[in-house]
Amino acid sequence: MADMDGFREANNFGFGQTSQFDNFHVKGASNYSWGMKDRLSRIFNPKTGRAVMLAFDHGFIMGPTSGLERIDLNIVPLVQYADCIMCTRGILQTSIPANINKPVCLRSDAGSTILTELNRNVLIDIEDAIRYNASAMAVMFSAGDGEQEAITAANLVEAVDMGNRYGIPVMGVTAVGKQMARDSRYFALASRVCAENGASIVKTYYCDGFEKVAAACPVPVVIAGGKKLPEKEALELCYNAVNDGAAGVDMG
């Protein structure tokens, strides 16, 4: 059994070398089924392999947080500028017009709110993802959380199993435990574990040394926004992330 003594710093990332096994515009997807490739092609531009994803799923743990009080007024006008939207099924069916013609990354797990510690996390039924014509399902993986790491890993695996059955990719969303340092070593661990468990996309945070995170992950990595930043800083963050290997952003 591996232990922390064997968790040595990696350094051979092959920066600048593309995968020898990719003949598809989405990293790591060459051997996927037709349906999986089709859905990923809706999210990632076939000409660039990149995506701008608009995330507004925050309400499922934070309620009507600032800027998301009225999805119909604040978010719907922005949808046309995104390649893909990420939201919950409740918001999708109540607030997003069905004729927007944008791929949906459906938030597919649910658990505690910000009022409590994470104590339970469950998956929605795969039939709902199909019913909402989801192009991907988003599921959290909480690395370094002694209480929830195994549970969220099991949820991720279950979602991948269901997604593979019906040709729907899964995006692993990394939530790093409180006791873990927010650095490239641990974001690389969380991202790689998502990919190793079958996630087709990984959402994580930008950090110093992010090029290691992206290079060591065999599927596309998109970055989360985190705390609100001034516009110029947010754009610089996105620019740096893409330069360091991110396939895009998933920000709200």
Each predicted region: which residue ranges?
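Alpha/beta enzyme core
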Residues: P46, A51-N99, P103-I223, K228-M251
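N-terminal amphipathic alpha-helix/helix-capping segment at the start of soluble metabolic enzymes
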Residues: M1-D57, G90-N101
